[in-house]
Amino acid sequence: CADKKPQQELTPWGTPVGEVESMDGSDDEESDGNAADSDAGAQAQQRGLSLSDIQDNGELIMLTVNGPTTYYDYHNHGMGLQYLLCEKFAQQIGVSLRVEECKDTTEMIQKLQKGEGDIIAVPLPRHILKGEKSSAGKNKTAAKSVSGDSKTINLLFCGVTPDKGKTQWAGVGGNKSLADTLNGWFKPKLIANVKKEESFLLSTASIRRHVYSPFLNRSKGVISRYDHLFMRYSGTARMDWRLMAAQCYQESCFDPNAKSWAGACGLMQIMPSTAAHLGLPMSAIHDAEANVAAAARYMAELQGHFSDVGDPAQRALFALAAYNGGFHHIRDAMALTRKYGGNPQNWGHVREYVLRLTQPAYYGDPVVKYGYMRGTETADYVDRIRARWSEYCGGASFHESYRGGSRGPHIGRGADSFNGAPVKSKRNYQRKYHI
């Protein structure tokens, strides 16, 4: 695909360098009445909620931006180093954590000033605020008000500092109790510990499996003890039963009792929220047939979301990607593909932009509505299922035909255009189903 994206230096959270150097707002022409709040209200905003107020409310409001190290949604769970650190701090003070996602640093400071958040949980470089150290202390910076009036807001840098003081979280200057608690709680080793925890959560090792399910009968082509279920429900899913089997292996290694840290359960690793949407009670989520049947309905639903993708084989790949990475993220990648001259109905083209949604220049693009995604994981998920399906079919590649039948669509031999990328032929492959 043609890629004409101009190169631009970005901060770690995706804001173009220099964009927030001037904190002056664009509302200078508003009337004085709109520019000024009551003095009492302004003072209350600048003080912010005290630690005891936050604890009484039972909620800490985290202001952040979307990104791989700040905050992103991963299978309906918050993820990102700064989010996980803030979550641990919220647990420490006995409250829940609510995330307010902002588009840039300026919006975070605006919301903090208005009392719409308690803490900016993004390491802010002090120099971007163009402030001078106040007499109140070395960690307090007075910055021009982002609302454009004559008021100032005191930011109190506190808590997490990943780089020896060059950057740090920030709260409202008057909120000393919250800042002192954050400073007392934070220890540099927390960053390393949380990084290890995040790495584990994102690994397959975090899925608790109870059985190992090898290929049952190579000579007779029996893939698993659940083949009859894949055959029965592949028509509902609108996919070849062996493709469904390959997806199941990727999800759970054919373990009906598998459970991930995020709560995904069963053969097809269905999330509780998805189970509720599909009418699958949690009491039945580990039942093999109920789980496969629900997953088949969900795959059919996802394929319906991609009804604009004309080729059924391509549509199946888009649905697999959405099963793993989320429908909205795949739509974002399709929008990028269209913008930069690719074919948004070809998985091979869209896959490239799924991968690029890990980069600030792309997940910050105006056509992207849902931000950062772990694109490498989703691309790998589809690649592995596709390769395993090829093994199950005796070395066929994903392409030539995808026609309906009593057991669901059948993917024929030959073919490398199923995902738009070539696949090395495995016709001489001696059925080594290494599972």
Model-derived segments and their meaning:
Residues 1-4:
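Bacterial signal peptide processing site
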Residues 7-124, 182, 230:
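Extracytoplasmic small-molecule ligand-binding "clamshell" domains
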Residues 38, 183-222, 338, 389, ...:
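Ligand-binding clefts/hinges and TM-proximal coupling segments of bilobed small-molecule sensing domains
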Residues 44-47, 52-53, 69, 79, ...:
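Acidic, polar ligand-binding/catalytic clefts
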Residues 167-171, 317-391:
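Catalytic and substrate-binding regions of cell-wall glycan-acting enzymes that process beta-1,4-linked
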Residues 205-254, 289-292, 306-310, 403:
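Export/targeting segments at the very N-terminus of extracytoplasmic proteins
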Residues 257-283, 290-301, 385:
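Substrate-binding/active-site groove segments that recognize
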Residues 377-435:
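Low-complexity, Gly/Ser/Thr/Pro-rich intrinsically disordered linker/tail segments
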